[in-house]
Amino acid sequence: MNMSRVEQQVIRYPAAKATPVGYLPDPASFNKFRVPASSKKSEQSNVKSILKRKKTDGFTNGVRDQSKIRPKLTETVKRKLSLGARILQVGGLEKIFKRLFRVSEGEKLFKMYQCYLSTTAGPIAGLLFISSKKMAFCSERSIKVDSPQGDIIRVHYKVSIPLCKIDRVNQSQNTKKPSQKYLEVVTVDGFDFWFMGFLSYQKAFNCLEKALSLSFEDNKEQ
């Protein structure tokens, strides 16, 4: 769906020295992106953030009008209460994160945010985890897919993006509806992911920016 008048803020990060080979390392996930090793060389200078602003008449990246997914205040409160109850039931964010995704040694979870991931089938509500190694999304509800045996099964939609694979983060908003804000994550291999409908948009962006900066500094020291 085309959207008129979008303002973007771009933050670009140098490619890291070492890069994992896949975006979805969790074997339980039905969608897997296999990515070849990046041919880009790591920059030797200190991390630099390049901020740009641009306005476009529209784009067709599968981003939907947030007015269709924007929850009412009562629905937002219910989502927060429901999430809080689930976190308490499982035993904390760390346990939820480790249940959903593979966690490497020394990996630290920073924050978790509720948002939507844009797909060709429409926005999917879920949880976005930001750690010292990756950003990872898991849908709140399971979806129906065909198994290799031809059966219909229900699985959670998962996307895991190593921080060292992220080339830039585009911070966008609809200039006609400033409350509609988006995060586009572009990888060094040309994949792009659109996140929207955040309950805490700016906090999520700041957390991701900090995680990327720390990740670059760690890779540079290795």
Swiss-Prot record:
Family of this protein:
Belongs to the GEM family.
Name the UniProt record assigns to this protein: GEM-like protein 4
Q: Which residues form the signal peptide?
A: none
Q: Which domain of life is it from?
A: Eukaryota
| Annotated InterPro entries | GEM-like (IPR037848), GRAM (IPR004182), PH-like_dom_sf (IPR011993)
Please list the disulfide bridges. Answer: none
Give the organism the record lists: Arabidopsis thaliana
- Cite the GRAM domain residue spans from the record: 95-173
